A protein has these predicted regions:
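Hydrophobic alpha-helical bundle cores within soluble ligand-binding/oligomerization subdomains
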Residues: 1-246
Length: 248
């Protein structure tokens, strides 16, 4: 122990700061360089921004980019898992009043409902199921909150995660293409951030007790719902929207 490097000294002031500035874990999938920005498994995120989102997810899960054959198989697995979504579990969302509550509250309820219906106990299977089913969950929440539950379109297995989300919302034509580009850029940019923010820390803390993937992610999303954390995501979306008017 005496030969180990000290990486941080905790002071009394740190204990009164809500862990601000205190390292709470390590991350092997990404890091943030103060000059060059975010890197995923050694790749600058800018080099990944034009890839399909599924391939970037594969990179984060396997620490390498997929071959064409692996990419095709990964897409097919996600499409199959999306088809198996327990839609009955999401009826709880239909009992909520359109426009009521915060969207993040709806998301946490939806996540826990999916988990109650289909937790397998296998971390990879549950993670893949959740990744595959998030587009439909988010589309349902958006339409139900807007009082338009009948607007949900059936998913298309040949479409990717972002494309299916846009499709299920009923967006078409040039608007669908532009929205898809913007959301894919936003999605890839937010996939991983070094593991030190509040939502990631909260999700890891809950997972450390061997809670399910669904419970852990719901906890992370509840942490994200606070304005001191989630407001940054909103500001980023506003920034991406401005960029989309220029050249995305």
């Amino acid at each position: 122990m005496g030969d180990e490097e000290t990486i941080f000294t905790i002071t009394e002031a740190n204990l009164d700061s809500g862990l601000r500035g205190v390292p709470v874990g390590t991350c092997k999938t990404s890091f943030v360089d103060p000059i060059e920005g975010v890197h995923y498994v050694g790749y600058p995120v800018g080099d990944l921004a034009n890839l399909e989102e599924e391939d970037v997810i594969y990179l984060l899960m396997h620490k390498r980019l997929p071959s064409p054959e692996e990419s095709e198989a990964f897409h097919a697995e996600l499409a199959h898992r999306a088809e198996e979504i327990p839609t009955g579990a999401l009826r709880v969302l239909e009992s909520l009043t359109p426009g009521s509550g915060h969207p993040m509250d709806w998301l946490a309820i939806g996540l826990m409902s999916l988990g109650a219906a289909d937790t397998t106990g296998d971390a990879r299977a549950d993670a893949m199921n959740l990744i595959a089913r998030m587009p439909e969950l988010m589309a349902r929440i958006f339409l139900l909150r807007g009082g338009k539950p009948e607007g949900l379109r059936p998913r298309k297995p040949e479409l990717g995660l972002v494309e299916n989300f846009v499709h299920m919302l009923g967006v078409e034509g040039d608007e669908a293409e532009r929205m898809g580009r913007m959301l894919r850029f936003f999605f890839i940019l937010h996939m991983d951030h070094g593991g030190g923010n509040l939502s990631t820390f909260s999700g890891k803390a809950v997972a450390s007790g061997r809670a399910s993937i669904y419970a852990s992610i719901a906890s992370a999303m509840n942490a994200l719902s606070g304005p001191l954390h989630g407001r940054a995501n909103q500001a980023c979306l506003e920034f991406v929207q401005r960029l989309s008017l220029i050249h995305i």
